[in-house]
């Protein structure tokens, strides 16, 4: 995909408006997890060192649109960013009619969702954003699947629109994993419901060699093979869909392997005892909470031999230690693999953190919904806009 890259432009003395994803958790006026802020630092520092007049924009939380609220203010983010950059980052509340910024200075524009028309990508607001800058930089992959004024419209009307380093790296990693993957390509899709991931399963099953399903999704596939699932979370109305996906994968030489053994409990709680059994032996009052050791070993073997791995979702209730072994084994196999690995989605990132795997995974995606939509084969509006603008 061809987009203009920020790193290829001369930014000296230019007004540069960067849309970042600084939507971080804040408690008592302090940022509690700054991963997204840190991820955006190389972009900000590049523009700053190039002598640009840097304006950052982001959303935070879900305020009522057009209404200022203290709890969704980016003030804590500006303070945190000042600490990380070692220089003051001014928070600007009223900026739609213009902002004074010095060369090399960084200012943070207040929450874009305080502006009426942001979510609907209104032309009037988009043009006001665009008028603030000489160069618009889209760097927020996490919101690239939404066509909003700050992620899409601003770029349509700005003199120049380009991709920031974070977004460019994200698109490159996803392209490497899906457009021209080194085979075998193995994907893991976990999560509680087939219905929410159906399009992803559908789309991936056409391109991968093996599609490992986990969590509640796997239970529906277990049921589709005629095995009992007891009181486990599964979707009876999607059993035929699961059968169809398995048959379609097989027909094109791929495979959706189904667990042969599972770890069950009697209730969803941290203290419920775990027991391991063959998948055919699940009792009527059992709930499946993880894949068993044989299944985990066979999946881990597939992953270690993979040329490319896409990981979205845990395979068990890893928050409870007695049901965490499957996710841990798969995570470690991915980390040990010589293949190219990309992981994304909130629960997946939590598992990577829990087992300290981050440094051994090739690329960790910052986007949840955007990552999924990319896997579904959808065109992300912000990316489509950047491609359009690159054509001139």
Swiss-Prot record:
GO biological process, one term: gluconeogenesis
Domain of life: Bacteria
Residues reported in the UniProt entry to bind substrate: 21-23, 36, 59-62, 113, 146
Protein EC: 2.7.2.3
Main EC class the enzyme belongs to: transferase
Functional pathway: Carbohydrate degradation; glycolysis; pyruvate from D-glyceraldehyde 3-phosphate: step 2/5
Record keywords, A-Z: ATP-binding, Cytoplasm, Glycolysis, Kinase, Nucleotide-binding, Transferase
Residues annotated to bind ATP: 197, 319, 345-348
One GO CC term, this protein: cytosol
PROSITE patterns: PGLYCERATE_KINASE
Alphabetized InterPro entries for the sequence: Phosphoglycerate_kinase, Phosphoglycerate_kinase_CS, Phosphoglycerate_kinase_N, Phosphoglycerate_kinase_sf
Assembly with partners or alone: Monomer.
Protein family (similarity comment): Belongs to the phosphoglycerate kinase family.
Protein name, as recorded: Phosphoglycerate kinase
Native source organism of the sequence: Thioalkalivibrio sulfidiphilus (strain HL-EbGR7)
Gene that encodes the chain: pgk
């Amino acid at each position: 995909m061809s987009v203009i890259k920020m790193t290829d432009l001369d930014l000296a003395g230019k007004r540069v408006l960067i849309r970042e994803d600084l939507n971080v958790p804040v408690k008592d006026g302090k940022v509690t997890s700054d991963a997204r802020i840190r991820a955006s630092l190389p972009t900000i520092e590049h523009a700053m060192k190039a002598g640009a007049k840097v304006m950052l924009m982001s959303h935070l939380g879900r305020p009522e649109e057009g209404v200022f609220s203290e709890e969704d203010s980016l003030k804590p983010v500006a303070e945190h960013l000042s600490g990380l950059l070692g220089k003051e980052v001014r928070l600007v509340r009223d900026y739609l009619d213009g902002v004074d910024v010095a060369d090399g200075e960084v200012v943070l524009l207040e929450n874009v969702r305080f502006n009426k028309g942001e979510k609907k990508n209104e032309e009037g607001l988009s043009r006001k954003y665009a008028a603030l800058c000489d160069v618009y930089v889209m760097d927020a992959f996490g919101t690239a699947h939404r066509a909003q004024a700050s992620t899409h419209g601003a770029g349509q009307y700005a003199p120049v629109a380009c991709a920031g380093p974070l977004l460019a790296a994200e698109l490159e990693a996803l392209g490497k994993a899906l457009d021209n993957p080194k085979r075998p390509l193995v994907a893991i899709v976990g999560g509680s419901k087939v219905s929410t991931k159906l399009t992803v399963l559908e789309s991936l099953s056409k391109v991968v060699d093996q599609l490992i399903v986990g969590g509640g999704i796997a239970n529906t596939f277990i049921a589709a093979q005629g095995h009992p699932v007891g009181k486990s979370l599964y979707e009876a109305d999607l059993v035929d869909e699961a059968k169809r996906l398995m048959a379609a994968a097989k027909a094109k030489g791929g495979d959706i392997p189904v667990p042969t053994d599972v770890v069950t409990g009697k209730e969803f709680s941290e203290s419920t005892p775990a027991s391991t059994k063959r998948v055919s032996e699940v009792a009527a009052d059992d709930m499946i909470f993880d894949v068993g050791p044989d299944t985990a070993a066979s999946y881990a073997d597939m992953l270690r031999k993979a040329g490319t791995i896409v990981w979205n979702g845990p395979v068990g209730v890893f928050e409870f230690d007695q049901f965490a072994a499957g996710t841990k084994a798969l995570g470690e196999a991915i980390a040990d693999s010589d293949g190219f690995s990309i992981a994304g989605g909130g629960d997946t990132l939590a598992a990577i953190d829990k087992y300290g795997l981050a440094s051994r995974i090739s690329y960790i995606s910052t986007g949840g919904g955007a990552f999924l939509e990319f896997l579904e084969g959808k065109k992300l509006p912000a990316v489509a806009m950047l491609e359009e603008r690159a054509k001139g």
